[in-house]
Amino acid sequence: MPLDTTTKQKLINVHQTHSTDTGSVEVQVAMLTERISKLSGHLQQNKHDFSSRQGLLKMIGRRKRLLNYLRSLGEDRYSQLINKLGIRG
C-alpha cells in the first residue's frame, strides 16, 4: 500500500537530517514504519490476504536491516529514532 505525497512529505520533514535529505536511514525507517502500520490494519480486516502478508514480512525484514545498520552507525541515533517512532528495538 503506497503512501500519499502529503504523508511522505510530513515524514521527511520530521525525520530529515538536513534540508535536502530524503533518503537517510531515519527517513527510510519512518516511511517503512508508516507503510507497515497501514498494511497491518488492512490485514486485520482481510485475514486471508496472503500476498499482502508476505509483503508485510518483507517490509519488516527491510526495516530490521536498516535499524541494525543505524545501530552500527551510532547507538544514540538508533535510540532516538526508536523512541520517536514508538517501535520496539
From Swiss-Prot:
Kindly list the places in or outside the cell where this protein is found, as annotated in its UniProt entry. Answer: Plastid, Organellar chromatophore
SMART domains, A to Z? Ribosomal_S15
Keyword match Lyase: no
Q: Name one Pfam family in it.
A: Ribosomal_S15
Q: What is its main location?
A: plastid
The alphabetized UniProt keywords are: Organellar chromatophore, Plastid, Ribonucleoprotein, Ribosomal protein
Q: Which GO terms describe its cellular component?
A: cytosolic small ribosomal subunit; organellar chromatophore; plastid
GO terms for biological process, alphabetical: translation
- Give the record's family classification: Belongs to the universal ribosomal protein uS15 family.
| Name the UniProt record assigns to this protein | Small ribosomal subunit protein uS15c
Q: Which organism is it from?
A: Paulinella chromatophora
Its gene? rps15
